[in-house]
Amino acid sequence: PALQGDLRRPAASPRRARADDEYLRTDHRICETVICVDRRMSYTAVNGILTGEMEGLQEEHAELVPLFKRMEELSGIVRERRRKRGAIDFDFPESKIFLDEKGRPLEIRPYERNTATKIIEDFMLLANETVAEDFYWQSVPFLYRTHDTPDPEKMKQLSVFINNFGYFIRMQQGEIHPKELQKLLDKIEGTPEEPLLARLTLRSMKQAKYTTECSGHFGLAARYYTHFTSPIRRYPDLQIHRIIKEAIHGELKEKRQAHYEQLLPQVAVQTSALERRAEEAERETEKLKKCEYMAKHIGETFEGVISGVSNWGFYVELPNTVEGMVHISELRDDYYIFDESRYELTGELKKKTYKLGQPVRVIVSGTDRMLRTVDFVLDRDL
């Protein structure tokens, strides 16, 4: 494991950081370091200590509790500062799938972000920004993680669509500030239409990518950003660590810089493409495992909420994050018409409606491993 207890690990770190009274970074130094792992802690354990839900752990790790508390305080300050500048935080439900030794799904649960995971996330984002800014001003060849401003036409289409639900976003000369999308996500939080509008907002934005030009990160509202913190699992981070080490040792001479100027554009294009391919493979694998899991529950009843509506039926999301479809052909009590503006199915005779966020009880009627889909039929409305 990368952080096994009682081991020393070589690393590169933004160290000797100084901050003013408002915790704004005023100075830093990036150097080679050695991480001394005194104790290996889990997110669950640290979160339990911070929330007070695990008193036994608080006593066992009493000398670390003040450190965790300071980390929590600093994390909150960093996150709030990011929020104020307009950073967008999509909080889509993620799945945690437990497999047996043969790769068969045993259980599926929602993966929940907690205080401990947010601390590490905030600190990693800050480290990434710090490294990106440092090497931008060194004017040496480098890899950046960039996220371009959304296409004006897509933002106009999003604006028209959300107006159907009573929301709006402000644009100026076809451009939008990330804070507008942040405010939209805040307004829809907890509403029945949140899953739909949040996904549409994400799809209306451009994909982040790796580039050699530091053009900023729209979603994070950051002027400088890179991927530095995960060299053991992401190639761009590893490439950056190589450049950093050469810079630290004074080896980035003219010849090496010319080498990187020729190499890095190819690295950026290839790693961006491979990242998209890996994400697609991950999504398809998750769908497959969910399909395999639900195949063991055909005929069983589950409670869920309607997460999407279309002219061919509606999707139902279960508490374990599995999503399946109730096909319109299974709604046999009436002839249902899809209202595209309100995202509702309404019965022509009885006027019964099925809409976003509506609780329903469903029976698993089938699965398709090839298509990676789950089919439901209604048991009865809640």
Question: What name fits each language-model region?
Answer:
Residues P1-R9, R15, A19-L382:
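Conserved, carboxylate-rich catalytic/transport cores that coordinate ions
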